[in-house]
A protein has these predicted regions:
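Short, structured segments at the rim of ligand-binding sites
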Residues: 1-447
Length: 447
């Protein structure tokens, strides 16, 4: 298909040609069960490691979305073989020595791929790979990771603007060794270093100079590397990690459901005095958004946890007068921020300054959206204080950000007259999101 640097849309996108949609309030409380698609974070880690593994990996439960499509297209261009067999994806990997001598890959808006791939591409001296992306992803933070890779011997050349994509990556005769990097910008930087580490010429030691943000995502990476045959030594406080040289081995894996996506349905039930059971979840998952279950309980929801499911029942009135540190589960800060509008007192959300540098400035995006809806919100550097009030009808921008779109949609199930522009941005992680809402009895109109 034709690549558009302004768009990450793929054959796995949904809502093609839909410019906006309207949501309408739930007329009757529901009691439903849902199954959630695969985790984007887990899927893209598995795709990349399988693509660099010896043998054929068999992956089930993988997510089909824009981000995962461009990831799989990338590993195919690098030489991996990919075949859909029933519900599984079979990926036959390549050795790093088999990376193409020269190639250009387009990764869409997939931040995970942008952070996981560069180090791996720098492990083969003879290859020269250029990573291109959408304009949105090009401007997100990359330089901290790239500077760390330079410490490890990887050669990077920026083709347009310093610290931004596109970038050309070339290996060197000697790679690996010791590297220092800040941990408070993005856990994806740490994961990218770890995933490349066994393929460098020398053992790699990573030292973090600041506290790590969202260490649970690093846990996901370490666990996934273990499943593909590589061990990581990590200190209890995550300040020091060491990886010996090794070769990834193919794996047969069922991939976890996406707890980030699950949170919108938990929040939906909590907001609308309804009950939802979400099946086939790993309730011992490293995915940090699992913490939202406890936050919803503090807000008054009734929670039942099983080993592979959770049931959320909404209260008569959501509780407010809370201060919630959402640093560990910051992808859901907008979700809780949207619920805060309907609580019985103000809610302050802290610890999420780093989400200013995601698909959009998510802190400012929520401030602007709630203000447009007539809600009093005080923006802080690391979050907001949101005072409940009467929501008025409005047409809201989604900022080409899937998290913004899914979070704002929750308010449309409570208040009539809310329209969302560019709803197809949910295809980044959950193309079927609005169809899933409709299956719960919510009226969704496409325009």
């Amino acid at each position: 298909m034709t690549i558009n640097l302004k768009s990450a849309k793929s054959p796995w996108s949904s809502l093609d040609g839909v410019d906006q949609l309207s949501l309408h309030p739930i007329k009757k409380a529901f009691n439903k069960e849902v199954m959630i698609p695969g985790s984007k974070s887990v899927t893209n880690r598995a795709f990349i490691l399988a693509g660099l593994s010896k043998g054929t990996s068999k992956l089930s439960g993988y997510l089909k979305s824009d981000d995962t499509y461009w990831c799989i297209e990338t590993i195919k261009k690098l030489g991996a073989t990919v075949e859909a067999v029933g519900d599984e994806l079979h990926i036959t990997g390549i050795n790093r020595s088999e990376l193409p001598e020269k190639q250009q890959v387009f990764i869409g808006s997939a931040g995970t791929t942008a952070r996981f791939l560069p180090g791996i591409l720098g492990t083969q001296e003879k290859s020269e790979i250029t990573i291109t992306s959408t304009e949105q992803l090009a401007g997100r933070p990359h330089k901290t990771l790239h500077d760390a890779l330079k410490q490890l011997g990887v050669k990077l050349t920026y083709l347009e603007k310093e610290g931004q994509l596109p970038v050309t990556i070339k290996g060197a005769p000697e790679t690996g060794g010791k590297v220092s990097i800040a941990g408070n910008q993005s856990s994806q930087f740490i994961s990218g270093l770890l995933m490349a580490a066994p393929l460098f010429n020398k053992p790699t030691e990573i030292e973090l100079t600041t506290k790590i943000v969202q260490s649970a995502y690093v846990d996901i990476t370490i666990e996934m590397m273990k499943q593909f045959g590589i061990h990581v030594d990590v200190s209890d406080d995550y300040t020091h990690m060491k990886v010996e040289q090794g070769e990834y081995e193919a794996a047969t894996l069922p991939l976890e459901a996406d707890l980030s996506t699950a949170c919108y349905f938990m929040a939906l039930a909590a907001l609308n005095k309804s009950t939802i059971k979400i099946n086939h979840l790993n309730m011992k998952s490293h995915q940090p958004d699992l913490e939202v279950v406890d936050i919803l309980e503090k807000m008054g929801a009734t929670v039942e946890k099983g080993t592979d499911y959770v049931v959320i029942s909404g209260p008569e009135q959501l509780k407010g007068n809370l201060t919630i540190d959402m640093n560990a589960c910051s992808d859901q800060a907008l979700t809780i921020g949207s619920l805060a509008v309907f609580a019985d007192g103000p809610i302050t959300i802290t610890g999420v300054e780093h989400i200013r540098h995601h698909e959009c400035n998510r802190v400012t995006a929520l401030t602007e959206s709630l203000t447009k809806l007539g809600i009093e919100v005080t923006e802080h550097q690391d979050g907001w204080t949101i005072t409940p009030g009467d929501v008025k009808a409005a047409t809201l921008d989604t900022y080409d950000d899937h998290r913004v779109a899914m979070s704002l949609s929750l308010m449309g199930t409570k208040v009539d007259g809310i329209k969302l522009l560019d709803p197809s941005c949910v295809s980044k992680t959950c193309p079927t999101y609005f169809e899933m809402l409709a299956s719960l009895g919510i009226l969704v109109e496409y325009h």
